[in-house]
Design a protein with these regions (language model features):
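Subset of outer-membrane beta-barrel
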Residues: 25-353
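Bacterial N-terminal signal peptides that target proteins for export
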Residues: 1-12
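Bacterial N-terminal signal peptides
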Residues: 10-20
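Charged, low-complexity surface segments at secondary-structure and domain boundaries
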Residues: 1, 15-17, 33
Length: 353
């Protein structure tokens, strides 16, 4: 009992420290480089796009929480592909290395390309096509403190270009994780993407902050059943997640459409917009199935008369020989969703013994 109290006290100290770090970065929920909030690997996409606590053999897990690095991920590498909405395509490469039993390093490179876009001048006349893309490098260090605690720090240079315009920014992540392997219990806290854009697309634009976010999550596996559940609270730094849209009287646009009082979000609805629920079905060591529900995604992408499976996501992973293959599909809107594919392996598994 004494050990449990010490662990809880230690985690609260770390949590308050991270929250204080995040609180200096105002303008919650806004900011530039919004692609940094996207799930760039299949495991994360299958768990609803938001998770900072799940412990697995997936090397990509430290992307959302640098404290999820561990010695078990030593020399693992992964490549991911994302087919996003509106013909946008992206990907991520990940690598981790354990310096020793206490110190771990990780690296992510991610990009999002938006294809060829139609160009127009200020008068609406068509010009040449142009391209746009976003890139980020995520450099991660984590240290095991003992008593089941790990803390981590990530630095991420960001580059973005639209046509002939470009910008550069620098962001940081800070995370903490408490993990009891014998309980299959994990608690994670992550302050993500706090930082600034230093060079602008054009001179008069001004400096803007990155889309910072504080997330906290709990993951617990059942002792006598192959299920592991996760609950993630998204945007601890911002209660109001009300993406407002006009209520349409019909499917046609009208100048008379206005927002109505019934669009006000009730307390319970707002609370659930912060929560992402996920479950993993662990079938042996070589296969798993994931499913999640993201209520905010369900509400924001819904049509007035149709929501369907909006907000649900599904994923599966299979180990074949020395490779792990994961795939996920996330439903965003009635007309479509996203597909993510990840392939990972351990470099050590190919070394001759």
């Amino acid at each position: 009992m004494c050990m449990i109290r010490v662990c809880i006290k230690s985690f609260l100290i770390v949590a308050l420290t991270l929250l204080s770090i995040g609180s200096v970065n105002a303008n919650a929920g806004g900011g530039v480089y919004r692609f940094l909030n996207l799930p760039f690997n299949a495991k994360l996409a299958g768990l609803g796009g938001e998770n900072v606590s799940v412990q697995s053999d997936d090397v990509n897990q430290f992307y959302t929480n640098p404290a999820l690095l561990s010695s078990s991920l030593n020399s693992k590498i992964s490549l991911s592909y994302v087919n996003y909405l509106a013909d946008a395509n992206g990907g991520m490469a990940s690598y981790s290395y354990a310096l020793d039993s206490l110190n771990y390093f990780g690296f992510n490179f991610l990009f999002m390309g938006y294809g060829d876009l139609d160009g127009y001048d200020r008068y609406g006349n068509e010009t040449e096509e142009f391209s746009a893309g976003d890139f980020a490098w995520n450099l991660v260090y984590a240290r095991y403190l003992g008593a089941n605690f790990t803390v981590g720090l990530a630095m991420k240079p960001v580059y973005s270009h639209i046509e002939s315009y470009s910008s550069f920014g620098l962001g940081f992540d800070v995370g903490a994780n408490y993990y009891r392997k014998d309980w299959d219990f994990s608690v994670g806290l992550s302050v993500r993407n706090f930082g600034f854009r230093f060079t602008d697309y054009y001179d008069e634009q001004g400096t803007e902050r990155l889309p910072w976010n504080i997330q906290m999550g709990i993951t617990k596996g059942l002792e006598h059943a192959p299920f592991r559940f996760s609950v993630t609270y998204d945007h601890l730094n911002d209660w109001s997640l009300d993406y407002k849209r006009p209520e349409k009287s019909n499917s046609l646009l009208s100048l008379e459409d206005t927002e109505k009082d019934q669009n006000e979000i009730k307390f319970a609805d707002m609370l659930f917009r912060h929560l992402v629920f996920g479950v993993e079905v662990l079938i042996g060591k070589n296969f798993h199935f994931d499913m999640a529900y993201n209520h905010r995604r369900n509400r924001e992408y819904a049509l007035s008369q149709a929501r369907g499976m909006n907000g649900f996501s599904f994923g599966a992973g299979l180990k074949v020989y020395k490779f792990n293959l994961d795939a996920a599909y996330a439903k965003y809107a009635p007309s479509g969703g996203t597909f993510t594919l990840s392939l990972s392996s351990s470099i050590d598994s190919f070394k001759k013994k």
